[in-house]
């Protein structure tokens, strides 16, 4: 039975799912907002919130944990020096998911906009 199993599989195996989260997190932190499907957006929200929470700590271990996921030194530097200080007084909810009215042209999948809260 599947009771109390959290998280979505998104029809991918675990390494593919992790690569998807990492790529979308990089895009979101680089550009500030991205458009994706609703289930991917809801999963990305928790992944990015965790990275920002680690960046708020600011210590070396947190930097290494974030670098493990983002694998981009310049982006980690941007996260720690520019993005995390904006959320110094915020206790969570660093990202926002807005459902869009239009659907994807190819398959009609519902789309959402994921953005960093100001």
Swiss-Prot record:
Xref: Pfam families: Ribosomal_L17
Originating gene: rplQ
InterPro entries named among the record's database cross-references: Ribosomal_bL17, Ribosomal_bL17_sf
Family: Belongs to the bacterial ribosomal protein bL17 family.
GO CC, any one term: cytosolic large ribosomal subunit
Species assigned in the record: Thermus thermophilus (strain ATCC 27634 / DSM 579 / HB8)
Gene Ontology molecular function terms on file: structural constituent of ribosome
Keyword terms: Ribonucleoprotein, Ribosomal protein
Protein's UniProt name: Large ribosomal subunit protein bL17
GO biological process: translation
Subunit structure: Part of the 50S ribosomal subunit. Contacts protein L32.
NCBIfam families: L17 (TIGR00059)
């Amino acid at each position: 039975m599947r009771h109390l199993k959290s998280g979505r599989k998104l029809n991918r195996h675990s390494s593919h799912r992790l690569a998807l989260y990492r790529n979308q997190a990089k895009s979101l932190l680089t550009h500030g907002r991205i458009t994706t499907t609703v289930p991917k957006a809801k999963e990305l929200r928790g992944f990015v919130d965790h990275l920002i929470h680690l960046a708020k700590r600011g210590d070396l271990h947190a930097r290494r944990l974030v670098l493990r996921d983002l694998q981009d030194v310049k982006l980690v530097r941007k996260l720690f020096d520019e993005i995390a200080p904006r959320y110094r007084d915020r206790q969570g909810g660093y990202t926002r998911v807005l459902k869009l009215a239009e659907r994807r042209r190819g398959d009609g999948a519902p789309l959402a906009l994921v953005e960093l809260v100001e």
